[in-house]
Amino acid sequence: QLIDPVTELRKWCKKIVHVHGKDATIDWDAVRHGGISGAVPFVWHRMPGFGDTNWRDIISILRSNGYEDDICIEGYHDPVYNGELEMTGQLHALNYLKWCRGGEFTPTPWEK
């Protein structure tokens, strides 16, 4: 449906208690030629970092609204990193999401 996840996240962020990390690559040529109901597939579900989603914005919005829990990476549906490559894709996605949040977690010494 081509709904912008960042716009929706801003509306619903205060109600979120669990996040699944999933990305998508849109084939805009297929959309322009056949629309989203055309005979040609226009979207491929990917692991975070391999699609079009702006994960830096998503993590910033989540954190600025108090979300402190995990992001569960979904990868079994990725057309590239599946089967024996799924764990490789999962690790790439994990490292990418860590980068998006600003790197490794380092607690502030004066905060409890």
Language-model features: where?
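Histidine-acidic metal/acid-base catalytic patches
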Residues: 1-112
